[in-house]
Structure formats: structure tokens, C-alpha cells
């Protein structure tokens, strides 16, 4: 006997819909998928597990969709909510694809696409599911027969992402005490975390876990003297070292220092010089360590060289798109410094010597003294990731 069918017009196109469709099938006018197929939880210096990734969300319905809540759940226990984003926490994580206008409402027009920056924490001892799912609560185009321009309340769970279990353990990229992690993980509004670039035909978040390392001097200051002199900064000229055994796969060492105090003219910045003088180190297993903004002619390695952990690669400088001397460091899954996916990692051994105030940093940037953020007794840490504005002794 032939299956009975009827013709329905949906989203401007006529679809043949079976009366006896499988019960588990569901029309989902708003679709979503992770930007990368997997993520990894790492323990930060706050003692919590951090998970950081992105979702690509597209509205396929003719009605404007409104995102109300996104919940993260485990595939093995979907009733237990691991993270919940709504209100300001939801809106602040929504981005347009590319360098579009700031998102002011949690809505997606017909055929529109948004990026959603996921970051949440779990207690250190909480078991992280092998697969995460995302439960969407939203208003969107309804099923066949619904008014064309009327949004209907809906809830469904989509967008699986795998969670790896092998943590990448690195050595420190620098030596000494008082190194401060600027622009670090994991707030969506952060300079590194919020930067997704369309490179080589795809959107990449190469700087998901990037850190800008600056050094406090004995007076808990980042610089002393003329702000426009690179030599006034405590970190300038510091030795940059290999975080693991590896092979040098790319270098640049010909660029001059920028004048500190402000970013260079954007017209002078290109994909080739944005990161200044740099080293890319292949540490195996499709993982690459990236060091940026090094001094001109300071590199002690060349492409093809094999290096050992702790070996000096070059000297910290102020080249490329930078307003003050610092070391930009991140780990990635390819040799392209912008067209790769940023990877999480932990550093095997260090001390936490303080936590600087984000309010003070916003008010004064790197000026003034920072002694109030230093601890009287640093604490030893093993296999943790330094979080934003933490002060680290290597």
C-alpha cells in the first residue's frame, strides 16, 4: 500500500512531507554546529575546569528567530544542565560573522548566521561528559501549517561537540618571577578570545587561549621612565624559551620595534607583519607553539632547527601590531598563525604570585603600581592554565 502524502509550502519552497514520519525527526528552523569538532577541558589557576569553543548558528526559517536560552548538557545525562546562558550572559556571547556591527538583540534574521562564544567552568572534580549537547529555547518559524510570519516557542537539543581527554602539558615560555597574563582566557569580550578571523575560506579562533605576557619589576610596575621607550619596560629583552622539544617551522626577524604607548597606524599592518618578528615551533601531534612580537635580529634559531625544551629562541620585543613590549604566546593546530584553531594547554609547574584587578587595568592599562594584587606567599601549581591577569613565577 502506498504511503499517504500531502504537499505543504514551507519557507517559500514546497516540501513533500510523509504523514508517517519517524517520531524522532523534528523540524529545527534554527540550526547550529560547533565551529571545531572537539574541545578540551583544562584546569585554570582558579581551580576550575574551563571549556571554551564556538557554535555557528543559522536561521533557516522565514521568521526572525529570537534566542532565549542556550543550555549545555551532557549527551549521557541530558537532564543535567552544566551551563546556562540567558539575558546578558547570552547576548554578550553572540557575534556576527566577520567584522559586522555589535549585536544588540539576540535575534537572527532569515538566512542569517551568528557565532556564539561558549565558555563555562566546572568544578575540578566534576566528570566532563565525552560529548556535549546544546539545548536551545527560542522563538522561531513554526511547523507546517503555522502562520508564515509568526514565531513559535520551541525547545530542542542539537550541536554535539566531542570533549577530548588528553591534556597538552607544556613548559613555560619565559623564565623568572612576576610574569603577568594579559588578554588571557576566557571572557567572550577579551581581545584574544573574541577575535575570529575569516582566513583561507574558514573562520578561525587561533587566539582562543592566547596570552600576552608582561613583567612586573621589583616595584610592581610594568615600566619605569619614558612610556615611549621600549627599554623602560621590565619585560623588554627577556629571553623567550621553547615550551617543548620541537622543530622550527617558521620565523621572521626583520621588523623594527614599534613606538610604545599606542597601536601603530592600521594602514601599516598586514597579515604578514601583524604578529611582528616571530617563531613557530612544531612540537608534534599537530600542535604548534607560536611566539610573537620578538626583537629584530634577536632570533637564535632558523627554520628547520631542532630545539630542546628551555632553549632560548630569541628576545622579547615590540614588533608588529602592539602598543607595548610583551610576548604573545599561543598553541594552535596548524602552521598558520591566524588560519589555525587555538588549542588549550597547561603549564607543568609554576607559582601564582598574585591576581591583578581588572577594574584597575581598565582604568590605567599598564601604568602605575600593582602591588595590591600580589600575594604575600605565592602558591605552587601543577598542570594548570594561567588565567587573565594572574601573576606567575616561572
Stretches with model-predicted labels:
Residues 40, 50, 192-242, 251-272:
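Short glycine/threonine/proline-enriched tight-turn/helix- or strand-capping micro-motif at secondary-structure
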Residues 241, 283, 287-310:
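Short histidine-centered loop motifs in beta-beta connectors
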Residues 80-127:
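Intrinsically disordered, low-complexity Pro/Gly/Ser/Thr-rich segments with frequent PxxP/GP/PP motifs
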Residues 164-182, 190-194, 224, 241, ...:
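Acidic, glycine-rich catalytic/binding loops that coordinate metals and/or anionic ligands
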Residues 246-248, 304-316:
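A structural signal for short beta-strand/turn segments enriched in small hydrophobics and glycine
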